[in-house]
């Protein structure tokens, strides 16, 4: 294998936590080059004050802190909702959606700064390494990628803490967190700790975004969500941008215990992983949007879209957001949304999100056709000829083989 040239300027995905703080110093030690730290605000609610100072004190030549929350909601969460993207029928893809946005922003910084390499803190066992690196390859194919967890000699957390102390890196860590967590506008995920045994029930004090359904209000909350072209544009008549919609639904859903999911999922690298997710806003949005499609899409389009939604979700989960097949799928999904306009009435109650009404000026639902009362639009005698033709292959097979 041809040896890679030593990098001269690296853009690092930086959070200020133990891993990326050590990586920053390690990159400086190992390559003796300039390192630019990049931090994205995607709704993680972490304290970003002091992050620039900490990054520079750890050795970064520059620290970028970008607020990407609106872009995340508008250009990543909303397209996923339009495409009904749910991985393995249950996971709403919060982390999977955030990584390509962060990597894209890093690519923009690399171009601006003339960097020749990227680095990230994802481990060699997870999906995030793939999501970051496929985006780098798609948007900046000529830049190097440095993944320290796949190359350095550190064995684990204790080694990182020792290195941080040696380098004078202020990492306020004394004991391991009970869980590995990732938070953004779409969700909060939990892995590790007692969750590694898939039979263990999560402890109630683990949850942050949602109250226990048993402790949720005894009175239901009703909402009306207005959609245009498949996107939620208003809640209870109040116009909102995608960021405001997500923040509002996260708050209301969380107060009613909506959006908890406990699953064992199949990682791209072949490992089964147990994850517990809190996705209050995303859950409400998905349920409302999917229901509105039931009256605005014709049967065949709806069924085909359901098939393709599984592919769509897999591509997102596997880090292929910027691939050709994703571009084509997004175009198809967006085309189907032309008439997904209307209002959905939602009831939130003790962990449940239930659609209790829907209406649209593009509704294909015709009460005159579907009524059980006497009607004039549908001639029931026409069904006999349809059934005879539709059942002809079955009848012929039975005639020959029985």
UniProtKB/Swiss-Prot annotation:
One of its GO terms (cellular component) is cytoplasm. It is found in: Cytoplasm. One of its GO terms (molecular function) is ATP binding. ATP binds at residues 13-21, 40, 121. SUPFAM superfamilies: Adenine nucleotide alpha hydrolases-like, Argininosuccinate synthetase, C-terminal domain. NCBIfam families: argG, PRK00509.1. Homotetramer. Belongs to the argininosuccinate synthase family. Type 1 subfamily. This is Argininosuccinate synthase. It comes from Leptospira biflexa serovar Patoc (strain Patoc 1 / ATCC 23582 / Paris). The gene is argG.
């Amino acid at each position: 294998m041809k040896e890679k040239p030593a990098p001269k300027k690296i853009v690092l995905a930086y959070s200020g936590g133990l891993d990326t703080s050590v990586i920053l110093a390690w990159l400086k030690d190992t390559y003796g080059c300039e390192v630019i730290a990049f931090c994205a605000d995607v709704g993680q609610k972490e304290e970003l004050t002091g992050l620039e100072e900490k990054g520079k004190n750890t050795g970064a030549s520059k620290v970028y802190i970008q607020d990407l929350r609106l872009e995340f909601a508008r250009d990543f969460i909303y397209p996923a909702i339009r495409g009904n993207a749910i991985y393995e029928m249950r996971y709403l893809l919060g982390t999977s959606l955030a990584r390509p946005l962060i990597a894209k922003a890093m690519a923009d910084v690399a171009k601006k700064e003339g960097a020749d390499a990227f680095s990230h803190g994802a481990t060699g066992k997870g999906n995030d390494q793939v999501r970051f690196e496929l985006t780098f390859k798609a948007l900046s194919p000529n830049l190097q990628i440095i993944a320290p967890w796949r190359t350095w000699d550190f064995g684990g957390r204790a080694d990182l803490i020792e290195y941080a102390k040696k380098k004078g890196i202020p990492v306020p860590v004394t004991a391991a967190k009970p869980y590995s967590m990732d938070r953004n506008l779409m969700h909060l995920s939990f892995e590790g700790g007692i969750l590694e045994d898939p039979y263990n029930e999560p402890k109630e004090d683990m949850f942050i975004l949602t109250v226990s359904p048993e402790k949720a209000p005894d009175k239901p909350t009703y909402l009306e969500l207005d959609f245009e072209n498949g996107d939620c544009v208003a809640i209870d008549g109040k116009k909102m941008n995608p960021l405001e919609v997500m923040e509002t639904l996260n708050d209301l859903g969380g107060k009613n215990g909506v959006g908890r999911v406990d699953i064992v999922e199949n990682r791209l690298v072949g490992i089964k992983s147990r994850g517990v997710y809190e996705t209050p806003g995303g859950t409400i949005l998905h349920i409302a949007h999917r229901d509105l499609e039931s009256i605005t899409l014709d049967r065949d389009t709806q069924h085909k879209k359901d098939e393709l939604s599984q592919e769509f979700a897999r591509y997102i989960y596997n880090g292929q957001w910027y691939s050709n097949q994703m571009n084509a799928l997004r175009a198809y999904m967006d085309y189907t949304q032309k008439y997904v306009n209307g209002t959905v009435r939602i009831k939130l109650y003790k962990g449940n999100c239930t659609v209790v009404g829907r209406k649209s000026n593009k509704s294909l639902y015709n009460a005159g056709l579907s009524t059980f009362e006497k009607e004039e639009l549908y001639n029931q005698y026409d069904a006999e000829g349809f059934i005879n033709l539709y059942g002809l292959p079955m009848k012929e097979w039975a005639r020959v083989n029985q």
